[in-house]
Amino acid sequence: MVKEQIVIIFNENKKRYGYRRITKELHNNDIRVNHKTVRKLMKQLGLVCQIRAKRKYSSYKGEVGEVAPNLLERHFKTNQPNRKWVTDVTEFKVNDQKLYLSPILDLFNGEVVSYNLSRHPNFKQITDMLEGAFQKLPDKVDNLILHSDQGWQYQMKSYQNLLKAKGITQSMSRKATCLDNAVAENFFGLLKTELFYLEKFDSIDQLEKAIVDYIDY
């Protein structure tokens, strides 16, 4: 029955709903199942959300600091948590205002480890995000890679020192190669397809609350 309902919801919404949105719809219909089960069933059924392609926000400003090697090399799977993390920044625009989202995703299960929303793409957004992630780790870690693109934030010495102090190894995508960070790109695409493109937001505050509800759901 659950599989049938998933297929119905998926098709009724023109294949734009991912596992989070479908889980919410199931709950609205008094079908209690967690989002991890829905994601697993969608994978078994071969249901893939059709993401609308939009212009990608880029924080790349050239080589303003040290560029780390690509250690991840598109190996997006791991059988343990806190072994491979990915991060990136995306931009939303409502009227003439902008909002920036910076999350860290664990490749073990695709869950959001930590995130930060900011009206400006500044370095404090990145450090606040890291602080939230570090609180979920022991004082010192081993064998954890944090992968990003070559955005200016990730080239900063302060950022790199924060990772080193925690025992985290930095990895970066090759220049202008978004597929090297495909999991983060897909997360942004899914969020925008399920939430941002489907609803009309009158203000940045309204959008910010919706994103928090979406991620924390």
Locations of regions flagged by a protein language model:
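Basic, flexible linker segments flanking DNA-binding modules
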Residues: 1-80, 177
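RNase H-like polynucleotidyl transferase catalytic core
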Residues: 51-57, 146-150, 166-183, 199-203
